[in-house]
From Swiss-Prot:
Family named by the database record: Belongs to the GatB/GatE family. GatB subfamily.
Organism placement in taxonomy: Bacteria, Pseudomonadati, Chlamydiota, Chlamydiia, Chlamydiales
Catalytic activity, as annotated: L-glutamyl-tRNA(Gln) + L-glutamine + ATP + H2O = L-glutaminyl-tRNA(Gln) + L-glutamate + ADP + phosphate + H(+); L-aspartyl-tRNA(Asn) + L-glutamine + ATP + H2O = L-asparaginyl-tRNA(Asn) + L-glutamate + ADP + phosphate + 2 H(+)
PANTHER family (UniProt xref): GLUTAMYL-TRNA GLN AMIDOTRANSFERASE SUBUNIT B MITOCHONDRIAL AND PROKARYOTIC PET112-RELATED, GLUTAMYL-TRNA(GLN) AMIDOTRANSFERASE SUBUNIT B, MITOCHONDRIAL
Top-level enzyme category: ligase
Protein name: Aspartyl/glutamyl-tRNA(Asn/Gln) amidotransferase subunit B
Keyword annotations from UniProtKB, A to Z: ATP-binding, Ligase, Nucleotide-binding, Protein biosynthesis
Subunit and partners: Heterotrimer of A, B and C subunits.
GO molecular function: asparaginyl-tRNA synthase (glutamine-hydrolyzing) activity; ATP binding; glutaminyl-tRNA synthase (glutamine-hydrolyzing) activity
Positions of disulphide bridges: none
SUPFAM superfamilies: GatB/YqeY motif, Glutamine synthetase/guanido kinase
Name of the gene: gatB
Biological process terms in GO annotation: glutaminyl-tRNAGln biosynthesis via transamidation; translation
Amino acid sequence: MGIAHTEWESVIGLEVHVELNTESKLFSPARNHFGDEPNTNISPVCTGMPGSLPVLNKDAVRKAVLFGCAVEGDVALFSRFDRKSYFYPDSPRNFQITQYEHPIVRGGCIRAVVEGEEKTFELAQTHLEDDAGMLKHFGDFAGVDYNRAGVPLIEIVSKPCMFSAEDAVAYANALVSILGYIGISDCNMEEGSIRFDVNISVRPRGSRELRNKVEIKNMNSFTFMAQALEAEKRRQIEEYLSYPNEDPKKVVPAATYRWDPEKKKTVLMRLKERAEDYMYFVEPDLPVLQITETYIDEVRQTLPELPHSKYMRYITDFDIAEDLAMILVSDRHTAHFFETATMSCKNYRALSNWITVEFAGRCKARGKTLPFTGILPEWVAQLVNFIDRGVITGKIAKEIADRMVSSFGESPEDILRRHPSLLPMTDDHALRAIVKEVVAQNTASVADYKNGKAKALGFLVGQIMKRTEGKAPPKRVNELLLAAMRDM
């Protein structure tokens, strides 16, 4: 990117549609469940039959209020539904029921760590609305599945408070973590239960103006989100640089784009509609939604400890690395696994590394995550304790971890009982002989160590561990090696 490009910055906001995991739809008793046969979870309400009337789902309201409390938003005592009119085959009523002017939650914030820096991203509002159906294409024809029509959504709208792709991805990750902790959505991006639309404009660095924004629809991975934002930033900057004397509104018009991952570029879908094009008006078949302060307080009391609070506690109380703490708290199941393991092991740093690095990598290779493998937290704690007590070496511990992930049903103790060959070397006489032999064969390294080159000691230890196949106790190896070199 040239110097001219570095003189510009992105201004980014996100609109996130989250399907709520209620039993039934937002305004009808039809089942809310993904993956069923097409058009089996429908009712007169969600298919727009004449005379059908919507009835608001109480559980959807509670989940929206719970989210508002989680992000410290202002939950409205009075909110209202509106009709957003548009024609499309997946909208059988030709309108969506949403909250245009009076949302259920205003404000709030999402806290995230971006490249080691803690940032707070402000929310504009969160509102309830129902989802559309799905168009499915089959060669030369298309079908409509209304199973999703009427599924309850919250749309979470941020302020334009992000200034890089890294900001946007960190915000999105933090948001998904919060939703997972409070349990209001499964956030399955592949199934579309959470969908990210990103809005981006650019401006000269130091400027406060907000130029026309471009919306990039339906980001279904964080990798694509980052790529799309970077590509669109470049496109807009190049447009402005190509037409420096033109009206900025004409150079980059407000529009909706999609991301093409193969071409690595954003592709125009349509120019932006205006609000009046949707002909918003008050939903006549629903009363004003009224809730009480008492109800909001009752919902707030059910909040669990949230990811950011847990993250701060981990790095202060457990003194673990910030990057590992972030991985641990990103998923509530992993955090629970770690905290259960800490009841049996007090080497928190080693424990966090084994959970987030060693076991996570092994489990990922098998398409699983550690909390859902059958491996108990106590077993990982036992493995770390065995290393700390010198029962096994780090190399043997990795072999045991391999076997734990392969079997998903054995503790380190069970594995050592069945495979005594994994136990460390206990023959001190044989170990002394190996140390003596290594020292005799590497006199240059011994001399280097005596001349102050600390790395030479590591080399000698490595040679001994190689000959013992990693089974020699490291502490004993160091003791014998230092003694042997002193005697030379």
